[in-house]
Amino acid sequence: MPAVGDQHKLIANPFEEPQRRISEYTAQEIATLQSRLEKQLGPEYLSSRAGPSGQKVHYISSEKCIQLANEVFGFNGWSSSIQNIQVDFVDEHPQTLKINMGISVIMRVTLRDGTYHEDLGYGHIENCKGKAAAFEKAKKEATTDALKRALRQFGNVLGNCIYDKQYLAKVTKMKVEPTKFAEDNLHRHSDFVKKEPVEADIMKVDSVGAGARPPALGNEESFEDLLGELDEADFNMADEGHPDEVVLPQAVHNSLNDKPVHQQLTNLNPQAQQSRPLSRSGSTGSLNTRQQPQNSHQFTARAQSRPPQQQLNSNQSRPMGQPVNNSSNANTPNNPQNYTTPQKPAPAAPAPQAGAAVAPAPETVGFFSAKAVTQLPEEALASGQVAPKPGLAFNPHAESPSIRKTPGIDHTKSKPLARNGQHVPPAKTTETEAEPSTSLSRPAGAHAASRPVTMNEARSASGSFSRAGPPMGGNAGNMGKPNVVNPQLDHTRRIGAPGMSGFSSSPSTNRGQYRPLTMKRPAPVVGGGAGQTKDGNGDSATTTTIAANTTAGSATGGNAAPSAGNGGRVPLTDMSANASNATAAGAATSGPEVKRQRLA
């Protein structure tokens, strides 16, 4: 049976103080708290406001004080409680009905080990319109002031250092840099958080048996080469036109210990490798692609299975950087346009031994355009086993509509062009030096009676428009020689310039060339003379002969004027004191009338 008074034990007495659990600090924790509390605050924790008589009053704001308490004691290491609230005064103005109020609060701050400090805080308000607003403002101010004063009793770090005048005079002179706002530290609602896409590289791994060994992948350099290809690739290509070709690397299926192709060919033909400079294929540009290692007997079997004509064509189209192991091509004389010396025949590759395992030939790999590569599956690109397909293969002979081309010119071949826009056949390499033209002056003697060579005949004989005479300059004899290095460019160098065989090729030689003057032929003179017609009617005039010129020259003192019919210059009339002599000499000679000078 329950005893008397047991019915009251089921209900807790609200007037009794509950038993508190006290967790004491260890000596190490006390030493740590003591070292923290002894430190002074930095200038970033201090605030200032205008005080009485224009002085600055420094204080610590409530939010910074609570933050410091949480840092030192922990968020669960301290607590605060209001011990007493007392209203000191409440005054209401009789006319304006405004309220003045003052409230004092006693606050206690307790640590988790039971240590506590109490202090008094005060709050007041003047000329408030309502009582509720006056009580709210006064009580909050008193409580905050009491809390800050209670916390400062624990040490300097919680605000006690502000009452040190020397410290305050020095710390206020320190400059505080503005803090940077960190948006990442904000606590955001899940609906307003920006969801950034996570780029996860999903690797497709084929299922491999427990006892099976995974296929050997390429070297680590292959991945670096792939990155290099992506860096140099041009992804900003237009939709129309033909983009640059892309070379797909072959997958490495053999073991990493096999020798690569260029090593085997270097052992087979070391002399050819030394004499030939390294070069790159025009289709690959500067991309370094790794070749698939193969055995030497595979190349030998392939070369024997092809017909001779196909081997010859493949060797001719092979770039300079790749070795040639075909002995028949080494004996063929080189083209004159190639500047390499003939190579010695390379020794033939040894025949495969009987019983040796012959690896199957790799699948054919073709060139694809940039648009076609995007249509290929990723599995085929990763394995490297991509066979050329019709419609996707790269066509090197396709013409781009975006490139302007001159109509009527074959753009597939490199040929010289004339000024009229037509192709010029290449000049013959067996062109001989032209003989110098005959001089116009003949020596006096047995050939004096013969007709001298006119200027027109000298031009036709020499094939040049330059003046007649011996070659000028020491290099005049080399002008007729063809261009041995590039014979097809001989005629392109001479476009627009006259033939210079046997004469100097300087453009200044054409400036002094002779041009006959135009003149009006006078009426024929009736009478016996060298310039008369045979019948005296003037129907047909004969050309002045050499004898007539010689006779006229003898009459005038040996200076005969060349006739206009032979292209000579007609001298002007002498206006000096010897004009009478010149007139007499002109009357004695036969021929057309001389050109007279016009008098003003």
UniProtKB/Swiss-Prot annotation:
It holds the Pfam family Rad52_Rad22. One of its GO terms (molecular function) is DNA binding. GO terms for cellular component: nucleus. It comes from the Eukaryota. One of its GO terms (biological process) is double-strand break repair via homologous recombination. InterPro entries: DNA_recomb/repair_Rad52, Rad52_fam, Rad52_Rad59_Rad22, Rad52_Rad59_Rad22_sf. Part of a complex that includes mei-3/rad51 and mus-11/rad52. This is DNA repair and recombination protein mus-11. It comes from Neurospora crassa (strain ATCC 24698 / 74-OR23-1A / CBS 708.71 / DSM 1257 / FGSC 987).
